[in-house]
Regions:
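Active-site and adjacent substrate-binding regions of carbohydrate-active enzymes
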Residues: 1-166
């Protein structure tokens, strides 16, 4: 079985929008930003796939093309929709706006944070045992700078034992 889809749809945003569920929209956005935060902090060269910067949903148009209909990977290979960028340009600084604008601004903040933290400049990354199945922990160290990251993959607050982190 192959799992295909855009990050936003796989994170639950598409379903939350269809169901007009504000709480689930918020959780989906938080899941997306968690994944982007990890991508930008864990090491290596981060990659944003087409449309992730504003939360593009699955594109089902591929099912209309017989040459593509049998390949579910086309669901996350949308045509570029330039009107999304125009909407971002019009409203990005206003503080209000769409889900796409919020995601875009948040990713921009994460990128700026990555640039400002010297510990993220190097390539060294060590996992931290959190003793909690919901929490991923890792440490980044570079030229005397140190950063520890904890990522909670649950929708609920989690506890880790600080004594085990020494």
């Amino acid at each position: 079985m192959r799992i295909s889809g855009t990050m936003a749809s796989l994170a639950g945003l598409e379903q939350a929008i269809e169901e007009q569920d504000e709480e689930q929209k918020e959780l989906a956005i938080r899941r997306m930003l968690l994944l982007h935060g990890i991508t930008l902090s864990i090491g290596g060269i981060p990659l944003l796939y087409l449309g992730e910067e504003w939360g593009t949903l699955n594109d089902y148009d591929f099912t209309k093309d017989p040459a593509k209909a049998g390949d579910s990977r086309w669901i996350h290979r949308p045509r570029m929709r330039w009107e999304y960028l125009e909407e971002l340009d019009d409203h990005i600084e206003s503080g209000s706006g769409s889900i796409g604008q919020r995601v875009f601004k948040s990713i921009r903040q994460l990128i700026n944070l990555r640039k400002s933290l010297p510990a993220l400049a190097g390539q060294e990354m060590d996992l931290v045992a959190t003793s909690n199945d919901h929490v991923l922990g890792y440490i980044r160290i570079y030229e005397g700078h140190r950063l520890i990251v904890f990522a909670n993959f649950s929708e609920h607050p989690q506890v880790i034992d600080g004594n085990k982190l020494r």
